[in-house]
Amino acid sequence: PITVPVGALVRVHVLNMVEYDPVASFHLHAQTFDVFRTGTSTVPGEHTDTVTLTQGERAILEFRLPERGRYMFHPHQHHMADAGAMGWFSAV
């Protein structure tokens, strides 16, 4: 797991570098996040629990985990998740 302090700002840089798939997503369980799409603004354009990126697209996600525990993340493309593209944030 990726360990973070409870309540601390977490910033995740995500990008879709998958050549054989037109889209990839990032979904966070039990928490939502602000989405800063690259090159668009210094103000988040979305607040959600899932972001979908096209090939070559990238974004910065920001959130805080308010409670101790494990928060699962994964793509909604099952073949990517089955190949290991999933994990946990552990808030301590």
Language-model segments: residues:
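Copper-binding active sites and cupredoxin-like electron-transfer domains
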Residues: P1-V92
